[in-house]
Design a protein with these regions (language model features):
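Flexible phosphate-sensing "switch/lid" loops adjacent to ATP/NTP-binding sites
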Residues: 1-174, 179, 189-316
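Hydrophobic positions on the alpha1 helix immediately C-terminal to the Walker A/P-loop
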Residues: 184-185
Length: 316
């Protein structure tokens, strides 16, 4: 079955508008590449590579972008200087593409900063992009999913992060990788907004959310495959070996429930209730998932990623 572009675009637009009508600000986590959605196109026939551009054209006058970067990527001692130069140049081009596509200069949010660990490199990174005209913000290291909520939602934790001032209602929270800290960025903002009487909320834009009860469904396997592709693309094979996307999803749901309960706001019962309009899967999607897995197995020279993709393929 060919993907109905106009229906999906209309439904997502309506749901975002509905969520915006109930709050002062909506922090919308955007899954995957915020510039090019061709990875989704590989699994969903007819899904446009510029789907997000089409949708957010409807919100261009009331939209800001947070672009999240892992502090660990800046501080990785195993990276050579040549890699750093390429990373800096790549980010410069990528941020410019975001600005051109969404009509706004993104905020850069550095997540997981440890001020006792090579902070001079983080400061160098900040200074470089500030000189390019970007606003750069700091979010500090915490173990968000293991920390008690009363401690996390305090002046010593989320309250100690930079509170990013925004003038628009819709804030897209993007990042290069699944580990860039998008959820905790949104949560810290919501906590700090509440402290100054701004009502804000969280939602997630993900065409293939990983929350089915059947752990071996095509949807869940597709979500895991795309997650592995993104991590491998940016050289994060060290994360891949012990990666379990479904456990991560469950961790996030537990965190969100506790987070909303602590703020005395009713939390949705299921992770899909945070997600903006999921796409239904059919038999054709199984075929496409198998095809993508086989392509990645043949393409990669990483034993870790090959093993992971073979494990996923064997589940179908």
């Amino acid at each position: 079955m060919w993907f109905n572009v106009s229906e999906y675009q209309n439904q997502v637009t309506k749901e975002i508008e509905h969520k915006l009508s109930n709050v002062n600000k909506l922090y919308l986590e955007v899954v995957g590449n915020c510039i090019d959605q061709s990875d989704f196109s590989r699994i969903i026939p007819g899904f446009p590579a510029d789907m997000w551009k089409r949708i957010f054209a409807n919100f261009k006058y009331d939209l800001e972008v947070f672009f999240c970067v892992r502090a660990e990527d800046i501080l990785d001692e195993d990276k050579e200087w040549e890699w750093w130069r390429e990373f800096k140049d790549f980010l410069t081009i990528y941020l410019k593409k975001i600005e051109n596509q969404y009509g706004t200069k993104p905020h850069i949010v550095i997540n997981g900063i440890d001020v006792e660990n090579m902070y001079d490199l983080v400061f160098w990174f900040e200074t470089y992009f500030q000189k390019q005209g970007y606003r750069v913000w700091e979010k500090y290291k915490n173990r968000a999913y293991e920390t008690s909520m009363s401690r996390l939602l305090s002046e010593d934790w989320f309250g100690n992060d930079d509170h990013i001032p925004t003038s628009k209602k819709l804030i897209l929270v993007c990042g290069l990788t699944p580990e860039s800290g998008k959820l905790t960025t949104a949560a810290a903002q919501i906590y700090q907004d509440k402290e100054i009487w701004i009502e804000s909320n969280y939602a997630k834009l993900d065409p293939i959310p990983d929350y089915n009860e059947d752990k071996n469904s095509a949807r869940n396997i597709a979500a895991q495959a795309l997650d592995l592709c993104a991590l491998h693309q940016y050289g994060l094979d060290d994360i891949i070996e012990n990666r379990n996307v479904l456990e991560k999803s469950e961790e996030k749901l537990k965190f969100l429930r506790k987070f909303y309960e602590f703020l005395r706001v009713k939390a949705p019962d299921k992770i899909e209730d945070f997600t903006v309009w999921k796409i239904e899967f059919d038999s054709e999607n199984y075929v496409n998932v198998l095809k993508v897995l086989q392509e990645e197995i043949e393409r990669t020279d990483s034993p870790i990623i090959q093993k992971k993709f073979i494990e996923l393929k064997d589940k179908i």
